[in-house]
Amino acid sequence: MKQIRNFSIIAHIDHGKSTLSDRLIQVCGGLTDREMDAQVLDSMDLERERGITIKAQSVTLDYKAKDGLVYQLNFIDTPGHVDFSYEVSRSLAACEGALLVVDAGQGVEAQTLANCYTALDMNLDVVPILNKIDLPQADPERVAAEIEDIVGIDAIDAVRCSAKTGVGVDEVLEVIVAKIPPPEGDPNAPLQALIIDSWFDNYLGVVSLVRIKHGSLKKGDKFKVMSTGQNHTADRVGIFTPKQTDKTELKTGEVGFVIAGLKEIHGAPVGDTLTLAKNGAEKPLPGFKKVKPQVYAGVFPISTDEYENFRDALNKLSLNDASLFFEPESSSALGFGFRIGYLGLLHMEIVQERLEREYNLELITTAPTVVYEVVMTSGETIYVDNPSDLPAINNIEEMREPIVEANILVPKEYLGNVITLCIEKRGTQVNMVYHGNQVAVTYHLPMAEVVMDFFDRLKSTSRGYASLEYNFIRFDPADMVRLDILINGDRVDALAMVIHRSNIRHRGLALVDKMKELIPRQMFDIAIQAAVGSQIIARSTVKALRKDVTAKCYGGDVSRKKKLLNKQKEGKKRMKQVGNVEVPQEAFLAVLKLNE
């Protein structure tokens, strides 16, 4: 057990952690050169395409250190993006240490900082590593000072390496062995194993990645899942070298997989504890905090007969993604679908792309909304995540919107733009600290403004240099109203949105104009209105297509033309009473894109 090291890598997007992990695998001979592939651990197509890590993965490597001993390194890959912080906290819970990888050219970023604090809170040993020293703009001295200044850990003797060229990778391995403590645990105590991650394999059923804290798990053991109390038999246990490799037993301190032929997707929830069915442990391990979705959106299949497939796809995906929440929803405009809760906008995009790709679904998503706290005149408090569930204005005593604390790290020269953006988004400044060339600003911002397009705007005003990390702090009273879109007097539920009263005029006009371009002309006039309660704040009309009825009159009397025009008018009026308007899918998507 003294020769085991469990660690993960904390790094910002693009600071090179997936490349570094490739090098570690190569040096330790986990894969032959032929099987080596760039970013081995990012196995999803989507991960490779966007160059980000979404799912936590694990690898067990054998490393012969300079002291002649062979160490077993269990490396758990973590995502770097703020939306996946939950995946990160899970990965860290299984480790004793973490490598903080920082790009020697760019320096520390907000999300790295957030994940690093998570690691320090969990009492992990954090070892700084400066990567990309082969780049011409690398400045390891400055970055080392920045790490000490901003993060507050010793970085003078940080290992300098370049994962791309392979310089310094051996030193990284030596540092892992020297600086990260071996796991603690009692091999003779009853089994306690933490489920770090689980996913569904079409052939094997549920595969769970576990970290054995105490005791050991052998192939063929009967074990019990502590939260559900169900017993299963371990058909296969083993490790990833990144390939699945079977073993007869997982010992204390090791990280590996367990397959028990579970077909029930929720049979092994992430963060749960496994113990043996006979003489098991008394109490479960402390898991992770359950995350609450922050952003909700309605998602509907484009053709209604896809609904069943959509439901199965969501069930399979939610096994893989413990933070996904969904419930059925129906809309008069879009039919049946689901209301899905996400951790943030990137998470939302990724989930939608995965559904479309991995399950061949065609989906349409309504505008994302956050959860509002509504105090009714009757005195009860309700939580609303769907604008069309909002009670009537006269029943609402007060609406409270979620406020987040956003920590932004930005180079000095872009500070002005960032502050302007935060003020426009109704933010209040809480703190500002200068660290060398970087400024750390803290703002309290309404979450609704952050989920819409804050991140993109932040990146564009700062030329991509600013980085953002945010978390929910409280609900604050705010003057929020529901903006409805009426088409020929009928409310379209899928287009409703909750916005601040100061924005309604501007937003209403923009929406109505956009809808006017997108709704195809019919045989009768279509009135598009934006309303708050019963008050109409903007309107435009899609003009009717009409035949030139007077074309056949040659010269002739004006009363003859009048008669024909009036007859046409009557007809159009009748059509308007019975006709209904199809709102095309583009119109819904346009509402999402309104802010751009």
UniProtKB/Swiss-Prot annotation:
Domain tr-type G spans what residues?
A: 2-184
Task: Output the PROSITE patterns linked to this UniProt entry.
Answer: G_TR_1, G_TR_2
Offer one Pfam family short name for this entry.
EFG_C
Q: What is its main location?
A: membrane
Positions with a binding annotation for GTP = D14, H15, G16, K17, S18, T19, N131, K132, I133, D134
Disulfide bond positions: none
The EC number(s) given in the record are 3.6.5.n1
User: What InterPro entries does its record include?
Assistant: EF-4, EFG_III/V, EFG_V-like, EFTu-like_2, G_TR_CS, LepA_C_sf, LepA_CTD, LepA_IV
- Recorded catalytic activity of this chain's protein: GTP + H2O = GDP + phosphate + H(+)
* GO process annotations (BP): positive regulation of translation
What role does this protein play?
Required for accurate and efficient protein synthesis under certain stress conditions. May act as a fidelity factor of the translation reaction, by catalyzing a one-codon backward translocation of tRNAs on improperly translocated ribosomes. Back-translocation proceeds from a post-translocation (POST) complex to a pre-translocation (PRE) complex, thus giving elongation factor G a second chance to translocate the tRNAs correctly. Binds to ribosomes in a GTP-dependent manner.
Q: Which NCBIfam families match?
A: lepA (TIGR01393), small_GTP (TIGR00231)
Q: What is this protein called?
A: Elongation factor 4
Q: Please name the gene that encodes this protein.
A: lepA
